[in-house]
From Swiss-Prot:
Region spans: Disordered: 1-51
Source organism per UniProt: Oryza sativa subsp. indica
Binding site for GTP: 89-96
Pfam families xref list: cobW
Family: Belongs to the SIMIBI class G3E GTPase family. UreG subfamily.
Name under which the protein is recorded: Urease accessory protein G
Family annotation (Gene3D superfamilies): P-loop containing nucleotide triphosphate hydrolases
Length: 284
């Protein structure tokens, strides 16, 4: 492989209504489809996937505490971007099904728009369109590339752009943002999500809540989905409830079967309660 003697310095600066972000990328002669890693000028380790935009990750030293989670931003201007609900969780837990259920529950009384994240396709957005969740023009699908969690935490501009645009186009009351499926360490930045939902399911067994991770411990609401599968996989819901309450210091969680509508009304109530508190609006 040919060597490269030159350096590349990339500086991106973008500001949001909640503050400024400055990303510095410093790459020393590392090229190629497989990406690579290097130490940036900021002292953080940066990497890229398959030639995609470089990014770094905030170090995570512990699963965190519910009581010490980042609070909603005080400086938020909802006229510029409506109250945003972030929905995260591992692959296959029911994020897109929840997006569909929330759209169906809220669209009659509230102006909604949705942004979905997939790694290399627009499948989740297409699913919502196919099932008539919202008019097609109110749904945007974003391809995040190899690190979907970076798009909801370290470099949120890929999501902020379409969310702000949709919010202004449709005078949205609520925005829904679904992350790409990821691991238990992924969680939304408060600069992107005013209310954070993390969804797991029982198919991984009843050990998942106690494994923790920022999503499980620090989301505003934890959803344990597909409870109807518990007997088939030998998952004990009582154990999951105990561990969820312990890991989340009593923070709220909902047992659900989103596909069958079980628990959806309770989830909607949690969202609207947070929306009322943040915006000063009354539910309709």
């Amino acid at each position: 492989m040919a060597s490269h003697d030159h350096d590349h310095h990339h500086h991106h600066h973008h500001s949001h209504d909640d503050g400024d972000h400055h990303h510095s990328h410093h790459q020393d002669g590392s090229h190629g489809g497989g990406g690579g890693s290097w130490v940036g000028e900021d002292g953080r380790v940066w990497h890229s996937h398959d030639g995609l935009a470089p990014h770094s990750h905030e170090p995570i030293y512990s699963p965190g505490d519910f009581s010490k989670r980042a609070p909603p931003l005080i400086s938020r201007r909802f006229a510029e971007r409506a109250f945003t609900v972030g929905i995260g969780g591992p692959v296959g837990t029911g994020k897109t099904a929840l997006m569909l259920a929330l759209c169906r529950s809220l669209r009659e009384k509230y102006s909604l728009a949705a942004v979905t994240n997939d790694i290399f396709t627009k499948e989740d957005g297409e699913f919502l369109i196919k099932h008539g969740a919202l008019p097609e023009e109110r749904i945007r699908a974003v391809e995040t590339g190899g690190c979907p969690h970076a798009a909801i935490r370290e470099d949120i501009s890929i999501n902020l752009g379409p969310l702000e645009e949709l919010s202004n186009l449709y005078k949205a009351d609520l925005l829904l943002c679904e992350s790409g499926g990821d691991n238990l360490a992924a969680n939304f930045s408060r600069e992107l999500a005013d209310y954070i939902i993390y969804i797991i399911d029982v198919s991984g067994g009843d050990k998942i809540p106690r494994k923790g991770g920022p999503g499980i411990t620090q989301a505003d609401l934890l959803i344990i989905n597909k409870t109807d599968l518990a007997p088939a996989v030998g998952a004990d819901l009582a154990v999951m409830e105990r561990d969820a309450l312990r890991m989340r210091e009593g923070g709220p969680f909902v047992f659900a079967q989103v596909k069958h509508g079980v628990g959806v009304e309770e989830i909607v109530n949690h969202i609207l309660q947070a929306w009322e508190i943040a915006t000063g609006n009354k539910r309709r």
